[in-house]
């Protein structure tokens, strides 16, 4: 299977994750297994990597590409949000590090029939796990106008959300919206031509919103990150790469909450909550890809890396 995927910020991931031989690590989003290979190489000869992916195609590719590492690699079909349960079933009670490279993969975008791209005609699908029900077409055709507008506004940060939702509801009266380019045409008609942005396709934000909703991406990130931080051993590190502000905000907020410690009101003379910091944040500001990497891999342009260490 042809599966093109170039790992984002590979050197930075290794720097902040700091994998070592004998350690137990989790890659919550295997994708093309680029990061996973680097972690397995860095933890040779006896480190273990548990890798998650809910995309059956990605998991198959990861198994093939990482077969040479034998039992040091444990592939898991499913969402990294289920990390706590899965690791307990594997008898793993703690990890030395984890990586979450969230969002849609290059392969998913480039595979037209998956329906993630607004540039090619395909079924309006957008499921990362094609074995479960619930496609983007289901949302577009079944949700009421208010709920559609909410999703597009909240997950896509689209200023024209209400107008787009209205146009979608009117268009589906003539028949179901089942193709990506059908939806693109509706979105283009909803956004006034003078409001189109020079470097951003008019459908970008709506497609992002539907993809996030179909795959519960933000909920998965919150649950998975909470679970991963709970499993992290003292001195262990967590690295998260996100690709838009909604994801980055979740990571930043959770890292800060774990690093805060005391949550007592400032007016109290002493701490009564007993809270202590559980994390040390390693990245005051998110790390971004360098110019050379962005030139070679445009997907890296919007990537933001945050890292923290368990206390």
UniProtKB/Swiss-Prot annotation:
Tell me which EC number(s) this protein carries.
Answer: 2.1.1.199
In terms of Pfam families, this protein maps to:
Methyltransf_5 (PF01795)
* Taxonomy, superkingdom: Bacteria
Instruction: Write out the GO biological process terms.
Output: rRNA base methylation
- Catalysed reactions, semicolon-separated: cytidine(1402) in 16S rRNA + S-adenosyl-L-methionine = N(4)-methylcytidine(1402) in 16S rRNA + S-adenosyl-L-homocysteine + H(+)
Intracellular or extracellular location(s): Cytoplasm
* GO terms, molecular function: rRNA (cytosine-N4-)-methyltransferase activity
InterPro entries listed in its UniProt record: RsmH, SAM-dep_MeTrfase_MraW_recog, SAM-dependent_MTases_sf
- Please describe what this protein does: Specifically methylates the N4 position of cytidine in position 1402 (C1402) of 16S rRNA.
Could you give one GO CC term from the UniProt record? cytoplasm
The name under which this protein is listed is Ribosomal RNA small subunit methyltransferase H
Q: What does the organism's lineage look like at the top?
A: Bacteria, Pseudomonadati, Thermodesulfobacteriota, Desulfuromonadia, Geobacterales
**Species assigned in the record:** Geobacter sulfurreducens (strain ATCC 51573 / DSM 12127 / PCA)
Question: Hey, which family's this protein in?
Answer: Belongs to the methyltransferase superfamily. RsmH family.
**Taking the first listed entry, what is the main subcellular location of this protein, grouped into a coarse class?**
cytoplasm
């Amino acid at each position: 299977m042809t599966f093109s995927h170039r790992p984002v910020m590979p050197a930075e991931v290794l720097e902040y994750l700091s994998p070592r031989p004998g350690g137990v690590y989790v890659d919550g989003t295997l994708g093309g297994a680029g990061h996973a290979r680097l972690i397995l190489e860095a933890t040779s000869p006896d480190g273990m990597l548990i890798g998650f992916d809910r995309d059956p195609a990605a998991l198959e590719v990861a198994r093939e590409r990482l077969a040479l590492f034998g039992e040091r690699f444990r592939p898991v079909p499913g969402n990294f949000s289920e990390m706590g349960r899965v690791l307990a079933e594997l008898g793993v009670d703690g990890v030395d590090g984890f990586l979450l490279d969230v969002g849609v993969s290059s392969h998913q975008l480039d595979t037209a029939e998956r329906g993630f791209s607004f540039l090619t005609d395909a079924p309006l699908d957008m499921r990362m796990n094609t074995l479960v029900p619930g496609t983007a077409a289901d949302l577009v055709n079944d949700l009421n106008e208010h709920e559609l507008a909410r999703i597009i506004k909240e997950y896509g940060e689209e200023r024209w959300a209400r107008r787009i939702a209205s146009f979608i509801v009117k268009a589906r009266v003539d028949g179901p919206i089942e193709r990506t380019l059908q939806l693109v045409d509706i979105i283009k008609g909803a956004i006034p031509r003078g409001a189109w942005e020079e470097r951003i396709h008019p459908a970008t934000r709506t497609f992002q919103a539907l993809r996030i909703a179909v795959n519960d991406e933000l909920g998965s990130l919150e649950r998975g990150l909470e679970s991963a931080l709970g499993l992290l051993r003292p001195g262990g590190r967590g690295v998260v790469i996100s690709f838009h502000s909604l994801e980055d905000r979740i990571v930043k907020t959770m890292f800060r909450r774990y690093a805060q410690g005391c949550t007592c009101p400032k007016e109290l003379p002493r701490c009564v909550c007993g809270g202590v910091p559980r994390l040390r944040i390693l990245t005051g500001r998110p790390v971004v890809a360098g110019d050379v990497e962005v030139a070679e891999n445009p997907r890296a342009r919007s990537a933001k890396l945050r890292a923290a260490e368990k206390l």
